[in-house]
Amino acid sequence: MENVRRMALGLVVMMALALSGVGASVMEDTLLSVLFETYNPKVRPAQTVGDKVTVRVGLTLTNLLILNEKIEEMTTNVFLNLAWTDYRLQWDPAAYEGIKDLRIPSSDVWQPDIVLMNNNDGSFEITLHVNVLVQHTGAVSWQPSAIYRSSCTIKVMYFPFDWQNCTMVFKSYTYDTSEVTLQHALDAKGEREVKEIVINKDAFTENGQWSIEHKPSRKNWRSDDPSYEDVTFYLIIQRKPLFYIVYTIIPCILISILAILVFYLPPDAGEKMSLSISALLAVTVFLLLLADKVPETSLSVPIIIRYLMFIMILVAFSVILSVVVLNLHHRSPNTHTMPNWIRQIFIETLPPFLWIQRPVTTPSPDSKPTIISRANDEYFIRKPAGDFVCPVDNARVAVQPERLFSEMKWHLNGLTQPVTLPQDLKEAVEAIKYIAEQLESASEFDDLKKDWQYVAMVADRLFLYVFFVICSIGTFSIFLDASHNVPPDNPFA
């Protein structure tokens, strides 16, 4: 008997709960039937023809996906916050068991047709059509999510130290200002307007290439077109240049250093031209790689392209000047005569200013005259008859080829009567004179050739200093100009 009672009590409780749930569902269904009995979603919710429907527009950013500079397109993941009042969707919560809000499919209610006007893919539709939230006061709020691909004009002058101002323009696609007026969205308390893009910190993922500096919004209208009105959201972002500094700028600086060190490489090394041309090819490769990163525009030249062109010009001149230096280095008296102005500038004037000192040649011990002894009354010239005619005092004389002939004449003219030299001695004297002249000519040839090599070395050192100064000034001036390119504190100033 007790068990029967318990079973009966359970059945009563279950039936009561079931009836209560069915009643709530029926009441909500009844409310929807009453609200939409004569509701037409195609009709603007204005009580009179002249009334304007106020639509509040806000934007919540969840992710800045990518900014494609090549096609000038920004891809973002956002929530569009729309709110308006529909007087036809009002009811008394007390008459419907305290129901204060309803969630209704967005296709069943009127929509203001707010679309992204500067979309880049031709798609004006919302990605996900979520339900709208309708309150008993007639307030309607709709927060659809979307992945927008908007056009963004890229200013490439200071790339990669640039900042961009990308806009997202929203307006009603079918209504003008005489029917729908746009306003900024309100905050959670409904007290003040939110005139900026809201960032959802819980869902936001920071972009690895761009940092968000400012995110204001503004209502725009045209004085020449009173029917036009839009709400524009500005996303001012600054590039993080670390990637380009590490992978482009630092290698270019190293290449420029190699181009400068070309002038420190001795011409006899044989790799002067190879190093110059290799540096030129490296800069060309970097220039081609960066061509795929920036838009194809003629409005301005990116600062990194200007720097690469600057380095390329320097390297090209280093190749040309290396040819000049090698030409100077391999000149000889047989092919070129050194002008006096070259000798004056490159041998006498410039070396002290370039910290170059030419080594002073000192005679080696092997080049000292050889001293021999000759005994008293020694004769070295013989008459044809066989007796000696030239006595020589006991002395130490130096045997030098260039003085031998003059000494013979002195002995012949000073101590004895003139005699005729034998033919074999004449030939020996002529041979010695020829050897002396050849030695002197070879010495002069070597000296002139070394002068040309010295001129080439001075020119190399001069180009080294000049290129170092030009490269340093050019590098600092170009990147110093980029350091002044910062986003403004007031975007609308």
Curated annotation (Swiss-Prot):
A GO CC term attached to the entry: postsynaptic membrane
Glycosylation sites: N165
Catalyzed chemical reaction(s): K(+)(in) = K(+)(out); Na(+)(in) = Na(+)(out)
Cytoplasmic side: 329-461
Entry's localization field: Postsynaptic cell membrane; Cell membrane
GO molecular function: acetylcholine-gated monoatomic cation-selective channel activity; transmembrane signaling receptor activity
Annotated keywords: Cell membrane, Disulfide bond, Glycoprotein, Ion channel, Ion transport, Ligand-gated ion channel, Membrane, Phosphoprotein, Postsynaptic cell membrane, Receptor, Signal, Synapse, Transmembrane, Transmembrane helix, Transport
Result when mutating N3D: In a second clone
Membrane topology: Multi-pass membrane protein
Name assigned to this protein: Acetylcholine receptor subunit beta
Organism in which the protein naturally occurs: Tetronarce californica
The gene coding this protein: CHRNB1
